[in-house]
């Protein structure tokens, strides 16, 4: 970036059209990139709207107007180079410096837009297009001037300027395995300022360039060396500011022509100019919480934000018209980035700023800040001038003055105008007389030429000679007259004679040429005529020959016809009588044969009729047999079909019933899921509404505090600068101001916390919406997933859920946009306070001590309250633990009750088992023996259950043996009653036991055995059993209550 030492920006040595120092504003273009995959997955919505008619961007309630807007509904990004950068490339050839600046948050597409990340020969970005346009322009004008190109590529990493084209620094070299630390082989590049105020770089490498491929190689080398890293927002995030500079030097040849006394003097000179094009790719602003950076990445992000803050302060200072008119200080020296861009912002350069933004509402705060900075940059006034050599400009000016003086001298050295007028009149008279004589001479000579041609054609006539002599005499007289006129015309006659001789020679040559051409044409016509005559004779001979051949063939055919006629007549005369005799004999024979043929035909017809009748009877018999067999086969098939259809109907009915049961079951599940989703939807809406209201309240409170903050410092400054107030009033105002500042910071933190929570809520809603849409589009895949929680929902329920989620996403997006706008305004005002120190209005040590004491007291009080809150939290936790213990005890009690309920059900099954034994006709002892034997074999049988239940009732506690004995006697008594009922004819035969839902039921083998009587027996058995077990149940409850009391005391 080191400038040529002989260049100057003076406009006095240049033409006004090319070197005038006219102010021009910085051109600003906005490039809106599309939503990326991660943003779509998180459910982000576009918070930026672009007008398709005017270059205007609307974000919430903030409208912004720029020079160009690309992406979204604006112009396509492919037009960015033609509309923004191509005029800057053309200005390089006129000596104007230019700068293209890409600004925006991390992940907004700055590197992609500029093309500094070029790899593998890709052509994306503005820099490759600049290369192509630059070399195309050079190729078109290289015959008029000479060019020299140099490029340099630097980066600003952690406030250090590094050379990316230094071949001694290896690519991707790391120090101690720590990424992002490049080992330098020499000291960093130093920034210097020349005596004429031009910023230069000491130690930066400038590579001479001859072709576009060499420039692309330098760009690729620097891009590979540039520091990049991975963050949560960008896999290849630029960790430094990069500046790619193209220096164009051109020497133009200048010629000046002067005319002095009929002599031409051409003086050649050279015009030298030099211009630079800076292509700047800034690193993006980032938040550590969003990027998830730490360690080295965190330090890099801090330096990046610090440099961008300094750039924002410079833009604010240059964009404020009031401060610019007052000549306020511009903080260029706060950062090395702003120091290098000093000429680009408010200096000798034509600058285009490209603000790259993300339309996602999750980045609303950063996007609004970018738009605000870009809007301020439009007010920056630059003063570009053409950088041309002063010496060459002075020489050009002197050449112009010399030409003017030469023209003036020629005008003064001429004769007087009257003499010139007289001489012009004489010349005009002589020229008119000369023209008249020349016209007459031309007429006579044309006549003479015509007569000469006539003399050639009529040489045989004798009259020619007399005419020729007369004409000759006339010509001689004309010549004599002409000679006399020549004598009177003075010196002009000699010139006229020479001209006439030259004219005569020309005419003779032209007429000779015409005659030769006519002769050639005549010869050509004659040759064509001869050729035509020869061709006609040949054709006539050919046709005559053909006619003779045809006549000959005609005669031959006639002779053959005559011979044939004669032979036919001779044959007819010689064989008339023999033919008549043979004809009669043949006629008799023919009649006899015809009679025989008729008789044979009649016999044949009779035989054919007989054969037909026989064939018909055989066919009828075969047809009847076939029909019989077909009927039998159809009968068998019909029977089989009836059986199959009956079986199919039975299976179909069973499947339909099974499917109906399954559908009912799924319907119940679907209804249950629907109710759960409705409850979830209501809860989510309530939570979202509550969070939105909290965010709105926090945002409103923050806005009020920010409005109050505007007037608070002003009031304090008035108190400080005016009359000394009372101590009590001053302390009160300071206390109020400090409370307001602390409350603003707390509210900012609260709004930011709500903002992050809202992002998480919106992400969860987006994930659920995405899964629902995927299950709607691909239902076969969703059924196979383990977490297909929505697969039981009906399509209508899913559509309702999708609509509800979309509405909640809209509400969440609007809340995010509002909070992002308020956070942006809060940060902007915080930066303005940083630019103007917060504590400037504290004028005395007494105020500072009072504020310090107040802060100390507030901090001590806050910590005491925190300790009290922690103590309350601990107490609440202890209460919660007690409640959890009670809950566990309640669950244990519920389990005990369930066990008792199961025991009672087993007792009922025991009664059923004893009933079954009485119906089988077995005795009491055999039944007991059967139960004891089978208890060991089948633990799930009713008898084994009876055995375990009896044993359980028998040994559950002291004093229960008699109760179990009485219960056994009651059960046996019931068994005897059931045995008596067996004697009645209405009892059925027991077939088998069937276990269903952990209960033993009885089934009968035949329907006519009336199984409904079993319910009456079971009812009677239950009443008896419950009456016997009531007392035992009360005793058990007393035992359990004692156990619970002891467990609670132990806990």
Swiss-Prot record:
Binding-site residues, ATP: 104-111
Gene Ontology cellular-component terms listed: microtubule
Gene3D superfamilies attached to this UniProt entry: Kinesin motor domain
Region (Disordered): 1-21, 916-946, 1029-1051
One MF term in the entry's GO annotations: ATP binding
Classification via Pfam families: Kinesin (PF00225)
Keywords: ATP-binding, Cell wall biogenesis/degradation, Coiled coil, Microtubule, Motor protein, Nucleotide-binding
Disruption phenotype: No visible phenotype.
Domain Kinesin motor: 25-380
GO biological process: cell wall organization; microtubule-based movement
Compositionally biased spans, kind Low complexity: 916-925
UniProt record similarity statement: Belongs to the TRAFAC class myosin-kinesin ATPase superfamily. Kinesin family. KIN-4 subfamily.
Comment on protein domains: Composed of an N-terminal domain which is responsible for the motor activity of kinesin (it hydrolyzes ATP and binds microtubule) and a central to C-terminal alpha-helical coiled coil domain that mediates the heavy chain dimerization.
Subunit structure: Homodimer.
Function according to Swiss-Prot or TrEMBL: Kinesin-like motor protein involved in the control of the oriented deposition of cellulose microfibrils.
PANTHER family for this protein: CHROMOSOME-ASSOCIATED KINESIN KIF4A-RELATED, KINESIN-LIKE PROTEIN KIN-4B
Protein name: Kinesin-like protein KIN-4B
UniProt gene name: KIN4B
């Amino acid at each position: 970036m080191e400038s040529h030492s002989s260049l100057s920006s003076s406009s006095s040595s240049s033409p006004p059209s090319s070197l005038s120092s006219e102010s021009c504003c910085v051109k600003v273009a906005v490039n809106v990139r599309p939503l990326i995959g991660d943003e779509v997955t998180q459910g982000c919505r576009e918070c930026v709207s672009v007008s398709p008619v005017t270059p205007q961007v609307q974000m919430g309630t903030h409208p912004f107007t720029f020079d160009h807007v690309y992406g979204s509904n604006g112009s396509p990004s492919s037009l960015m180079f033609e509309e923004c950068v191509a005029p800057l490339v053309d200005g390089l050839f006129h000596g104007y410096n230019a700068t293209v600046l890409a600004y925006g948050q991390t992940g907004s597409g700055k590197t992609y837009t500029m093309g500094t990340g070029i790899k593998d020969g890709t052509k994306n970005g503005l820099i490759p297009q600049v290369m192509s346009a630059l070399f195309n322009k050079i190729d078109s004008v290289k015959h008029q001037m000479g060019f020299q190109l140099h490029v340099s590529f630097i980066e600003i990493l952690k406030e250090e300027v590094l050379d990316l084209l230094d071949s001694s620094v290896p690519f991707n070299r790391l120090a101690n395995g720590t990424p992002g630390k490049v080992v330098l082989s020499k000291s960093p590049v130093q920034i210097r300022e020349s005596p004429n105020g031009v910023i230069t770089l000491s130690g930066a490498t400038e590579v001479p360039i001859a072709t576009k491929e060499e420039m692309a190689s330098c760009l690729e080398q620097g891009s590979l060396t540039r520091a990049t890293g991975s963050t949560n927002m960008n896999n290849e995030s630029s960790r430094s500011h990069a500046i790619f500079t193209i220096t164009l030097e051109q020497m133009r040849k200048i010629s000046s022509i002067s005319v002095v006394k009929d002599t031409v003097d051409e003086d050649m000179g050279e015009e030298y100019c030099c211009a630079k094009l800076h292509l700047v790719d800034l690193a993006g602003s980032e938040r550590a919480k969003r990027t998830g950076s730490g360690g080295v990445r965190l330090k890099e992000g801090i330096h990046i934000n610090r440099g961008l803050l300094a750039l924002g302060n410079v833009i604010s200072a240059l964009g404020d018209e009031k401060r610019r008119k007052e000549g306020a200080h511009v903080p260029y020296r706060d950062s090395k980035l702003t120091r290098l861009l000093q000429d680009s912002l408010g200096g000798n350069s034509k600058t285009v700023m490209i603000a790259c933004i993300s339309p996602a509402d999750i980045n609303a705060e950063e996007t609004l800040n970018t738009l605000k900075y870009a809007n301020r940059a439009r007010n920056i006034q630059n003063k570009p001038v053409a950088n041309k050599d002063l010496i060459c400009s002075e020489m050009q000016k002197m050449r112009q003055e010399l030409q003017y003086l030469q023209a003036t001298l020629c005008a003064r050295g001429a004769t007087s105008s009257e003499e010139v007028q007289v001489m012009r009149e004489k010349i005009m008279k002589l020229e008119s007389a000369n023209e008249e004589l020349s016209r007459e001479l031309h007429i006579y000579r044309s006549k003479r030429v015509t007569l000469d041609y006539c003399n050639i054609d009529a040489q045989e006539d004798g009259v020619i000679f007399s005419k020729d002599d007369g004409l000759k005499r006339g010509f001689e007289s004309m010549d004599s007259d002409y000679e006399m006129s020549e004598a009177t015309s003075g010196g002009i006659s000699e010139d006229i004679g020479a001209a006439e001789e030259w004219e005569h020679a020309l005419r003779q040559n032209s007429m000779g040429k015409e005659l030769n051409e006519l002769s050639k044409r005549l010869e050509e016509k004659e040759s064509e005529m001869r050729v035509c005559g020869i061709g006609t004779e040949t054709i006539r001979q050919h046709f005559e020959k053909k006619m003779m051949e045809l006549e000959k063939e005609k005669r031959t055919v006639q002779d053959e016809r005559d011979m044939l006629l004669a032979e036919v007549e001779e044959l007819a005369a010689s064989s008339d009588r023999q033919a008549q005799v043979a004809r009669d004999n043949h006629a008799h024979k023919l009649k006899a044969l015809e009679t025989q043929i008729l008789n044979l035909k009649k016999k044949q017809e009779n035989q054919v009729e007989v054969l037909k009748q026989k064939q018909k009877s055989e066919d009828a018999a075969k047809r009847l047999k076939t029909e019989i067999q077909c009927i039998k086969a159809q009968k068998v098939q019909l029977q089989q079909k009836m059986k199959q259809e009956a079986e199919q109907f039975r299976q179909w009915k069973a499947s339909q019933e099974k499917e109906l049961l399954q559908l009912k079951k799924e319907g119940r599940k679907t209804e249950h899921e629907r109710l759960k989703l409705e409850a979830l939807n209501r809860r989510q809406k309530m939570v979202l509404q509550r969070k939105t209201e909290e965010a709105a309240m926090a945002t409103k409170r923050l806005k009020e505090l920010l409005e109050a903050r505007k007037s608070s410092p002003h009031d304090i400054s008035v108190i400080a600068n005016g009359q000394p107030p009372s101590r009590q009033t001053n302390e009160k105002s300071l206390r109020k101001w400090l409370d307001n500042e602390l409350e603003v910071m707390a509210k900012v933190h609260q709004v930011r916390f709500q903002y992050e929570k809202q992002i998480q809520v919106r992400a969860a809603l987006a994930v659920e919406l995405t899964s629902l849409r995927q299950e709607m589009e691909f239902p076969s895949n969703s059924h196979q997933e383990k977490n297909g929680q929505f697969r039981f929902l009906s399509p209508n329920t899913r559509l309702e859920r999708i609509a509800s989620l979309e509405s909640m996403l809209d509400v969440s997006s609007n809340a995010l946009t509002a909070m992002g706008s308020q956070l942006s305004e809060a940060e902007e005002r915080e930066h303005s306070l940083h630019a103007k120190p917060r504590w400037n209005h504290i004028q005395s040590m007494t105020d500072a001590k009072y504020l310090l004491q107040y802060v100390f007291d507030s901090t001590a009080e806050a910590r005491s309250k925190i300790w009290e809150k922690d103590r309350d939290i601990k107490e609440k936790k202890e209460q919660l633990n007690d409640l959890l213990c009670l809950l566990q005890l309640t669950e244990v009690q519920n389990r005990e009750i369930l066990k008792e309920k199961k025991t009672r059900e087993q007792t009922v099954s025991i009664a059923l088992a004893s009933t079954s034994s009485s119906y089988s006709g077995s005795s009491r002892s055999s039944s007991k023996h059967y139960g004891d034997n089978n208890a060991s074999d089948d633990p799930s049988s009713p008898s084994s259950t009876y055995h375990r239940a009896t044993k359980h009732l028998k040994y559950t506690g002291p004093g229960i043996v008699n109760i179990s004995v009485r219960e056994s006697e009651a059960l046996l008594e019931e068994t005897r009653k059931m045995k008596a009922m067996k004697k009645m004819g209405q009892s059925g035969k027991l077939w088998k036991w069937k276990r269903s839902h952990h209960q033993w039921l009885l089934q009968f083998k035949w329907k006519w055995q009336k199984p409904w009587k079993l319910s009456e027996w079971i009812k009677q058995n239950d009443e008896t059993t419950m009456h016997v077990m009531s007392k035992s149940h009360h005793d058990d409850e007393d035992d359990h209550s004692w156990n619970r009391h002891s467990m609670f005391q132990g806990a």
